[in-house]
From Swiss-Prot:
Organism: Hahella chejuensis (strain KCTC 2396)
InterPro entries cross-referenced by the UniProt entry: Ribosomal_bL36, Ribosomal_bL36_sp
Protein name listed in UniProt: Large ribosomal subunit protein bL36
Biological classification of the source: Bacteria, Pseudomonadati, Pseudomonadota, Gammaproteobacteria, Oceanospirillales
Single GO molecular function: structural constituent of ribosome
GO cellular component: cytoplasm; ribonucleoprotein complex; ribosome
Family per similarity comment: Belongs to the bacterial ribosomal protein bL36 family.
Chain's gene name: rpmJ
GO biological process: translation
Length: 38
């Protein structure tokens, strides 16, 4: 999980979601693409 100021989609499998007020990226194809804004 990377914590970044701005989260971006890195590939086709990435999806931007909101959990508990935080913007996150989850990826089905590449788990290393997981990101959290903060």
């Amino acid at each position: 999980m990377k914590v970044r100021a701005s989260v971006k989609k890195m590939c086709r499998g990435c999806k931007i979601i909101r959990r508990n007020g935080a913007v996150m990226v989850i990826c089905s194809t590449e788990p290393r693409h997981k990101q959290k804004q903060g």
